[in-house]
């Protein structure tokens, strides 16, 4: 049996290799990139369709018989069961970490030459489908972005694309995922630009557009033309609402800050429970189930709750958002219910992911934004602060404001909401809200929720071309190992012989275990090299000196450059945690490779 599997794998690899060789001879890489962009868009839309189907069928099976007028104790059970099934799937089938989908894509772009594992093409779809279907309060967007990006990455690896094209194909997958799941091609394009920070030149714009349009078209074919949000504009934009829009943007920025800080704190808390997975499951599951029991709007992605707010015209209509809860029928508590959902959604999302579920923060950002916008408008109107503001419009603008604040992506917020609802007449207020939200959150956080973790570790690829070039450089790219080590007791006469065989001015002094004791800098002993009468008086131990700084294998290129700047050294040794020499890095090699990367990034 094993021999048959081995033969099959060999035949498969041989067939793929022949196909790639044929492509290299007959189709240029530029043309192949466009073909792959189309395939990525198609596959991303199919993945989104399957995920939507899994979530819909599970939720239909579990909750279709629930009475909207009464609470249901099964809300206390379903989320825990879903997270437990997800844990089993990840532990025994996937056997890898698939959380933080968009952050994982950013990390792949920044530090791993855009390489994602093959199982990411499907594992997140299944895991998040189970989690969300059983009530996990997370979004499907991040898993689909990881899936689309993995499809692009693996196709790029199969066809042996270069690093720059790999980044582009990952961007195609991510943009196709957003475009497909929301039927919003422009939003998919600007998402890649703003969130994944992939620089778009004219050469890279076309493949991403092809992926976005392809994914959107096939999603329409598979799922119909119905929009995710059911919105009809009944109150056009009016100039006297500008102050309210500005204040809503500030409010969204502050809510975004609350969301990001709370999410980060909860992640840190659940990380401490990692050695105890079942304690984590029980604790997080109980928090999630309790919140969903009290506020059923937190069940799953929550888009249906936002649709209630968008379609409603009065308190009786909006009161339907409290169905299946203890609050149902008490419309006087609507504002309290909306406020509680707004500020507890982040705990439900954190508990879902922290206890072992799989999902993203994209949908939670939209839901919190929608509820926050409605809450702001309702309080404004009830208290008669100023001119009347339509709750439906402000629900939409709140979603755009939260997307902008949490993701630092104003264009994504504007175009996503406009494309989702057809509300292009709200462009002006959407821009006002998004700009004021971004300005507010930027005072406190300079990175998006996805980029924050990588930025702290110096692993984030940005639009700043100098920093991006350094990020793309890895320690393995610049480390050199063609050195001639010498022992500390070597006489100077033999040291001179070693110097004659060396191609650089750097000779490390090592003990028998390979631990770095010091270095010989030829430029510092040149004055005695030619005085043979002194050879018998000196050994390496007497001539060596301590390096002005040492590098470790895990230093980022920013840290490497800082040490070079502080020491003005030409070469610096690289050691491991035990002090064993692993190689050295020269200033000239870094600058040479840096210039090459900048040239590649700048080329069309």
Where are these predicted regions, by residue range?
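ATP/adenylate-binding site constellation spanning eukaryotic-like Ser/Thr protein kinases
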Residues: 211, 433, 480, 522, ...
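Short hydrophobic beta-strand motif reused across regulatory alpha/beta modules
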Residues: 517-525, 584-591
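Alpha-helical transmembrane segments and immediately membrane-proximal extracytoplasmic
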Residues: 1-472, 476-482, 486-507, 511-517, ...
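Post-kinase regulatory C-tail/linker adjacent to protein kinase catalytic domains
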Residues: 457, 540, 601-604
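The conserved cystathionine-beta-synthase
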Residues: 486-503, 510, 529-532, 536, ...
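Structural signal for short hydrophobic segments within the conserved structured cores
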Residues: 482-486, 542, 547-550
């Amino acid at each position: 049996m094993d021999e048959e599997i081995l033969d099959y794998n060999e035949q498969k690899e041989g067939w793929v290799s022949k196909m790639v060789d044929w492509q290299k001879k007959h189709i240029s890489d530029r043309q192949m990139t466009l073909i792959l962009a189309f395939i990525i868009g198609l596959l991303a839309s199919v993945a989104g369709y399957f995920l939507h189907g899994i979530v819909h069928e599970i939720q239909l099976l579990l909750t279709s018989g629930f009475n909207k007028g009464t609470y249901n104790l099964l809300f206390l059970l379903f989320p825990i069961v879903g997270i437990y099934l997800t844990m089993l799937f990840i532990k025994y089938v996937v056997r890898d970490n698939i959380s933080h989908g968009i952050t994982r894509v950013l990390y792949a772009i920044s530090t791993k030459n855009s390489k994602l594992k093959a199982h990411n093409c499907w594992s997140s779809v299944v895991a998040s489908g189970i989690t969300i279907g059983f009530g996990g309060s997370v979004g499907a967007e991040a898993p689909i972005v990881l899936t689309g990006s993995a499809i692009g990455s693996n196709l790029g690896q199969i066809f042996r694309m270069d690093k720059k094209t790999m980044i582009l194909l990952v961007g195609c997958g991510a943009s196709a995922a957003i475009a497909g799941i929301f039927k919003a091609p422009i939003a998919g394009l600007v998402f890649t630009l703003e969130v994944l920070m992939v620089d778009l030149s004219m050469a890279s714009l076309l493949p991403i557009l092809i992926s976005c349009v392809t994914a959107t078209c096939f999603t329409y074919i598979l799922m119909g033309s119905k929009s995710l949000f059911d919105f009809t504009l009944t109150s056009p934009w009016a100039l006297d609402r500008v102050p309210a829009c500005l204040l809503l943007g500030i409010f969204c920025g502050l809510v975004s800050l609350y969301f990001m800080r709370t999410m980060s704190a909860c992640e840190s808390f659940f990380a401490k429970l990692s050695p105890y997975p079942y304690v984590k499951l029980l604790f997080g599951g109980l928090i999630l189930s309790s919140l969903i029991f009290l506020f059923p709007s937190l069940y799953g992605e929550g888009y249906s709750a936002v649709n209630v707010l968008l379609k409603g015209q009065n308190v009786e209509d909006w009161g339907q958002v409290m169905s299946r809860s203890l609050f149902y029928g008490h419309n006087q508590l609507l504002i309290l219910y909306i406020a509680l959902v707004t500020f507890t959604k982040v705990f439900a999302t954190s508990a879902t992911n922290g206890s072992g579920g799989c999902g993203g923060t994209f949908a939670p950002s939209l839901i919190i934004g929608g509820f926050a916008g409605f809450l702001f408008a309702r309080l404004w109107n009830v208290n008669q602060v100023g001119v009347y503001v339509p709750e439906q419009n402000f629900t939409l603008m709140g979603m755009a404001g939260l997307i902008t604040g949490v993701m630092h992506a104003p264009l994504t917020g504007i175009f996503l909401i406009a494309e989702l609802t057809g509300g292009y007449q709200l462009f002006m207020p959407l821009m006002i809200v998004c700009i004021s939200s971004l300005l507010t959150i930027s005072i406190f956080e300079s990175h998006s929720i996805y980029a924050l973790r990588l930025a702290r570790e110096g692993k984030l690829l940005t639009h700043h071309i100098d920093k991006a070039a350094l990020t793309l450089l890895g320690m393995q790219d610049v480390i050199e190992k063609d050195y001639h080590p010498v022992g500390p007791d070597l006489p100077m006469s033999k040291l001179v012989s070693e110097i004659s065989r060396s191609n650089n001015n750097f000779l490390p002094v090592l003990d028998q275990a390979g631990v770095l004791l010091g270095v010989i800098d030829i430029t510092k002993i040149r004055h005695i090299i030619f005085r043979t009468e002194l050879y018998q008086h000196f050994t390496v131990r007497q001539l060596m000196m301590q390096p002005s700084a040492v590098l470790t294998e895990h230093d980022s290129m920013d840290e490497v450059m800082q040490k070079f700047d502080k020491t003005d050294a030409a070469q610096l040794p690289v050691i491991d945690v035990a002090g064993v020499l692993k190689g050295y890095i020269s200033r000239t090699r870094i600058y040479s490779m840096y210039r090459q990367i900048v040239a590649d990034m700048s080329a069309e």
